[in-house]
């Protein structure tokens, strides 16, 4: 499941679309907690919620059959789903997005707290990977749903399902031209949408990013969701809302939210936040490419970016020799690979369109760097 338009602004069009979707998900009435028949704020938790098939031949072929949406109007999320937004979203070729979480009745989200559980949680300073402070462990049966919209029209809905303790599955649904329902795709697909080509990922491509090393669900973390959301019953901090709904197994430690790449943080903070959401999925210890660590919490010297020679494998790709040259984005492979759309592009999966705001942010940051630490 990919993120939304990045430096263009989590609080801009993507956030507005998510808030619009929230009014659908939050429209039902109720007052009981998560273990009751309805959740406060209009969320209903007594129903089965999203379907998580245990066998692939049991998979619903239409989005309207998944339980994640209103079957009579699949453009509306089911009342069992809770909408959310993130502080630092992933660039998804300019698409606006709606985001939701579905939990099976009676289950809770476990938020990693390294002070409370040092045996199973490692902080970044101690080399933590998927066990990072503030990571959300979603229970078996949980589903993360994201809806991608181009020009206000639904193009794709992705479901990431936690099937067993060790198994996750990703599903891509293609919306019909009428916008009335979406069909499960058996494989990847490239489709013209407006003036761009939209890529629907295969199931294996979904899991190429949603790895154990990256924490599987990716977006739902304390630092990403520590922000207000415009729910149907009023604006509220998302962590407080999830707590009020009884969705956590204990009150999570409050961690500062990531800076918005288009927000008021320093240039370095905003650039590092962008790299965290757009690059650190793979570039972190234990993930796909572990010789760099681009997580926000890591000190700049430990990212292995500045004045670091590219790998021997990259050397065959006709790239700039250095990952990051202080003051010179044009001679930095980090910038180069964000600007191209050829086979050397980063990220390799999930984006065919250069992010104009994101590339400018990273170029401005590289230009501002005077020396390596």
Name every feature range the model reports, one short phrase each.
Residues 1-50, 126:
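Ser/Thr-rich, Pro/Gly/Ala-heavy low-complexity intrinsically disordered linkers and tails
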Residues 45-48, 135, 154-373:
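Sequence context surrounding c-type heme c attachment/ligation sites in exported
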Residues 47-123, 132, 138-185:
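Conserved small-residue
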Residues 53-55, 72, 118, 125, ...:
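Extracellular/secretory pathway and lumenal proteins
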Residues 80-85, 127, 276-279:
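Short amphipathic alpha-helical surface micro-motifs
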Residues 128-130, 206:
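Long, well-ordered early-domain segments
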């Amino acid at each position: 499941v990919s993120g939304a338009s990045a430096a263009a602004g989590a609080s801009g069009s993507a956030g507005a679309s998510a808030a619009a979707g929230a009014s659908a998900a939050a429209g039902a009435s109720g007052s009981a907690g998560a273990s009751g028949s309805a959740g406060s704020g209009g969320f209903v938790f007594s129903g089965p919620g999203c379907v998580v098939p245990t066998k692939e031949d049991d998979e619903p072929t239409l989005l309207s059959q998944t339980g994640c949406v209103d079957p009579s109007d699949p453009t509306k999320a089911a009342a069992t789903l809770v909408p959310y937004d993130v502080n630092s979203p992933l660039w998804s070729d300019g698409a606006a997005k709606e985001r939701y979480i579905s939990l099976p009745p009676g289950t809770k989200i476990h938020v990693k707290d390294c002070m409370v559980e040092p045996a199973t949680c490692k902080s970044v300073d101690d080399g933590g990977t998927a066990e990072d402070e503030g990571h959300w462990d979603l229970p078996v049966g949980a589903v993360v749903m994201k809806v991608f919209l181009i020009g206000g029209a639904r193009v794709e809905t992705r479901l990431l399902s936690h099937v067993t303790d060790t198994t996750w599955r990703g599903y891509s649904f293609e919306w019909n031209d009428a916008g009335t329902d979406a069909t499960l795709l058996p494989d990847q697909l490239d489709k013209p949408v407006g003036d761009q080509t939209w890529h629907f990922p295969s199931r294996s491509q979904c899991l190429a990013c949603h790895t154990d090393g990256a924490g599987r669900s990716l977006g739902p973390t304390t630092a990403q969701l520590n922000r207000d959301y415009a729910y149907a019953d009023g604006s509220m901090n998302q962590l407080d809302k999830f707590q009020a709904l009884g969705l956590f197994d204990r009150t999570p430690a409050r961690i500062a939210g990531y800076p918005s790449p288009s927000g008021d943080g320093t240039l370095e903070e905003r650039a590092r936040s962008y790299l965290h959401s757009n690059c650190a999925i793979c570039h972190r210890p234990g993930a796909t490419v572990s010789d760099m660590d681009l997580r926000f919490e890591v000190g700049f010297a430990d990212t292995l970016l500045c004045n670091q020679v590219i790998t021997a494998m990259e050397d065959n790709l006709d790239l700039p020799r250095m990952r990051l040259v202080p003051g010179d984005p044009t001679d930095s492979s980090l910038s180069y690979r964000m600007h191209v759309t050829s086979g050397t592009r980063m990220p390799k999966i999930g984006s065919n369109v250069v992010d104009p705001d994101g590339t400018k942010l990273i170029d401005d940051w590289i230009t501002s760097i005077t020396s390596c630490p």
